[in-house]
């Protein structure tokens, strides 16, 4: 199986400006993510950025693709990368978030293999079980709902599916149900990326602020499967960053 990995790395993060260059135990965030990706089976790893400072830090350790600053979503940025690299329509690109320095290489391989094995899907992604009510009712934890064939039915920031009886009268009983946290790693076919950028943002996409809903609104099948390994949460805030620094301080 052949696939590429692209790591989008924007300097102008809303909640944590300069996040890709944040130092984590002697290495920048973007370097740590790229090194994890290099341990996967990908044919090639690229970092996509709109900031020369990020490219300068990476030097010649990872190929860098400079992109425009005005992309409305990460998927749009990936399409520019695919175009600049002249990738074939049936090539597979895995998008690994630039704030996932602990991403297991095995899940990168997994999501690429899942897309390759499901020719009726144009996207593939992963999930993991939600085991506490704090995560289920947290709008920053995106929930995934999928059918018995692994096809996505919906993604939401709301606690879906809603357990009518267990959640009655303000209860938050998670027994007897299954809830899944969406993990923000995607595999795409290049032909789909060229389609995606032609579509206007969908109503549900704008309401939930979830770009995968644009694909679903246009009839695209998305494959979803539980991750083969635990995927630690990404770095969204200064608190997340400090926790990771403490965790990796001796490495």
Curated annotation (Swiss-Prot):
Catalytic activity: 3-deoxy-alpha-D-manno-oct-2-ulosonate + CTP = CMP-3-deoxy-beta-D-manno-octulosonate + diphosphate
EC number of the protein: 2.7.7.38
Keyword tags: Cytoplasm, Lipopolysaccharide biosynthesis, Nucleotidyltransferase, Transferase
Pathways per UniProt: Nucleotide-sugar biosynthesis; CMP-3-deoxy-D-manno-octulosonate biosynthesis; CMP-3-deoxy-D-manno-octulosonate from 3-deoxy-D-manno-octulosonate and CTP: step 1/1; Bacterial outer membrane biogenesis; lipopolysaccharide biosynthesis
GO cellular component: cytosol
Gene Ontology MF terms in the entry: 3-deoxy-manno-octulosonate cytidylyltransferase activity
NCBIfam families xref list: kdsB (TIGR00466), PRK05450.1-3 (NF003950), PRK05450.1-5 (NF003952), PRK13368.1 (NF009905)
Family: Belongs to the KdsB family.
UniProt name for this protein: 3-deoxy-manno-octulosonate cytidylyltransferase
Organism: Alcanivorax borkumensis (strain ATCC 700651 / DSM 11573 / NCIMB 13689 / SK2)
């Amino acid at each position: 199986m052949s696939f590429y990995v692209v790591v989008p790395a924007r300097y102008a993060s809303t909640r944590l400006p300069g996040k890709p260059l944040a130092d984590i135990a002697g290495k920048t965030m973007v370097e740590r993510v790229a090194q994890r990706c290099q341990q996967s089976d990908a044919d090639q790893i690229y970092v996509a950025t709109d900031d020369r400072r990020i490219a300068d830090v990476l030097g010649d350790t990872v190929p860098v693709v400079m992109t425009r600053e005005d992309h409305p979503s990460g998927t749009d940025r990936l399409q520019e990368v695919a175009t600049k690299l002249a990738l074939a329509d049936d090539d597979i690109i895995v998008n690994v978030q630039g704030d996932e320095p602990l991403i297991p290489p095995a899940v990168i391989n997994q999501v690429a293999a899942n897309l390759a094995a499901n020719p009726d899907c144009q996207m593939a992604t992963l999930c993991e079980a939600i085991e506490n009510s704090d995560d289920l009712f947290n709008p920053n934890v995106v929930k995934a709902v999928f059918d018995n064939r692994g096809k996505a039915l919906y993604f939401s920031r709301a606690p879906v599916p809603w357990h009518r009886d267990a959640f009655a009268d303000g209860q938050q009983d998670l027994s007897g149900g299954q809830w899944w946290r969406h993990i923000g790693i995607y595999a795409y076919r290049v032909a789909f990326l060229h389609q995606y950028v032609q579509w206007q943002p969908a109503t549900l996409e704008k309401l939930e602020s979830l770009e995968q809903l644009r694909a679903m609104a246009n009839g695209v099948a998305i494959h979803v499967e539980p991750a083969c390994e635990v995927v630690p949460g990404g770095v969204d805030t200064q608190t997340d960053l400090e926790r990771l620094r403490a965790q990796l301080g001796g490495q």
